[in-house]
Each structure stands twice: as structure tokens, then as C-alpha cells.
Curated annotation (Swiss-Prot):
Belongs to the ribose 5-phosphate isomerase family. One of its GO terms (biological process) is D-ribose metabolic process. The gene is rpiA. The keyword Oxidoreductase does not apply. GO terms for molecular function: ribose-5-phosphate isomerase activity. The active site is at residue 106. This is Ribose-5-phosphate isomerase A.
Length: 236
């Protein structure tokens, strides 16, 4: 079974999970290839929800294509659930997210939800976070300041270029990748994140940081994880 089949399988499992929610509510929807499979699987059941709140421009485009109603987060009081993938997830449900560059939108929508339903394949499960480079979204003016502060954590800091992300965004490959918010992203490699909540708080206090791709405060409540044997449901 290949990676796409695993993503499709867990996307369909997430569809079944959210259809257990009472009808007429607003659903939070994440970003990325696994989230896309979830959106596609849910399309035939969009009438179950009063609308959706999207974590990125790309997700909004896909939801609208399928006929979902997409609401402004500022007009929504709260969400019963937020469904999204992860770049890494540890045994406690802490995650690294932001490989696709939309960590700030994802964290905002996740904070609105009563539960975070994480969907991924088993390759994303790790004993300790840090094998995947940790994304940090910053104000461009602060690149030097934030880079020096991040180096104190012991990792290698690099500025993400447009060529290292999605080609469909039509950004100049040799220029810094620009987020939906106009920010840049610093990727911190070589970390071993034994205390995700502590590191999340410390990095978020650095002047110039918009947010860090550690989801410890907004950790997963439910994990749907696919492997060759099927989909396992883990509650944290």
C-alpha cells in the first residue's frame, strides 16, 4: 500500500468520525495532502455541516470547489472539531506542523475547536519530536534576531525558500517563501524536543516570531493513523 492510499484511507476514516457530530455545526478544516483526501471524502456529505472554517487559502479553494460554505473565522464563536494532518506526532499527541507553510492559520483554527482530530499515516509517529525540521513563522524584519535566538536551542536554522515548497503558489524559487500572512519561515533542524510545551512557549516569546509549528498547547485529542492493516483510533 503506497502513501497516497494510506492518506486516502485515513481521510475516509476522518469523514466517518466527523459525521458522528450533530448536524448543523461548523467544522474546522486543515491544510495539506492528507487534509485534501479528507475534504474530497467529505464532499458528498457537506450538507451535514452549516459551513466550514479554513486554515489556508489553498484549503479554502478546495472547499469552495466542492461546494462547501466557507465562513470567516471572525464570524464563528467556536468549532466542535478541527481536522488536520501532522508532520510528526509523539505518544502524547504533541505535533510538529507547518511543512506546508500555513502553521499560523492552522494554530488559530485549532484553538477555536473543542477537539483536534489529527489524521496521518504511521510514518508520522515518533517517540520524540524533532526529526522533522521545526518551522517558525516570522516577521521578515526579524530574520537575523530570531535566527540567533533559535540557534541557542541547538538546532541549525535555515530560511525557507520558495523552491522548497509548493510550486503551484507561483513564487520566485530563489526568493524566501512567503506565507498567507506575508511572513517568512525559518526551519530549525537537528532538535530533540523532549518538552514540547516549554519550547513552544519559549519560542513564541521571541520578538518577531508570529508562531512556532509546535502544537503542544493545541495538541491532538484524537489520532486517526493508517497503516497496511487499516486505521487505528487513539484518544489522548
Amino acid at each position: 500500500m503506497n502513501q497516497d492510499q494510506l492518506k486516502q484511507m485515513v481521510g475516509e476514516a476522518a469523514r466517518d468520525e466527523v459525521l458522528k457530530l450533530p448536524a448543523g455545526q461548523v467544522l474546522g478544516v486543515g491544510t495539506g495532502s492528507t487534509a485534501n483526501y479528507f475534504i474530497d471524502a467529505l464532499a458528498l456529505h457537506k450538507g451535514h455541516f452549516a459551513g466550514t472554517v479554513s486554515s489556508s487559502n489553498a484549503t479554502t479553494e478546495r472547499l469552495l470547489k466542492h461546494g462547501f460554505k466557507v465562513l470567516d473565522p471572525n464570524d464563528v464563536q467556536g468549532l466542535p472539531a478541527y481536522v488536520d494532518g501532522a508532520d510528526e506526532i509523539d505518544p502524547a499527541g504533541h505535533m510538529i506542523k507547518g511543512g506546508g507553510g500555513v502553521l499560523t492559520g492552522e494554530k488559530i483554527i485549532a484553538s477555536m475547536a473543542k477537539q483536534f482530530i489529527c489524521i496521518c499515516d504511521s510514518s508520522k509517529q515518533v517517540p520524540v519530536l524533532g526529526n522533522f525540521a521545526l518551522p517558525v513563522e516570522i516577521i521578515p524584519l526579524s530574520q537575523g534576531v530570531v535566527s540567533r535566538e533559535l540557534e541557542k536551542f541547538g538546532g541549525r536554522v535555515t530560511l525557507r525558500l520558495a523552491k522548497h515548497t509548493r510550486a503551484d503558489l507561483n513564487q520566485t524559487p530563489s526568493e524566501p517563501f512567503v506565507t498567507d500572512n506575508g511572513g517568512w519561515i525559518l526551519d530549525v533542524a537537528g532538535l530533540r524536543i523532549a518538552s514540547p510545551a516549554q519550547m513552544e512557549a519559549q519560542i513564541n516569546q521571541i520578538a518577531g516570531v508570529i508562531t512556532v509549528g509546535l502544537f503542544a498547547k493545541e495538541k491532538a485529542n484524537i489520532l486517526l493513523v493508517s497503516n497496511a492493516a487499516g486505521v487505528e483510533r487513539i484518544q489522548f
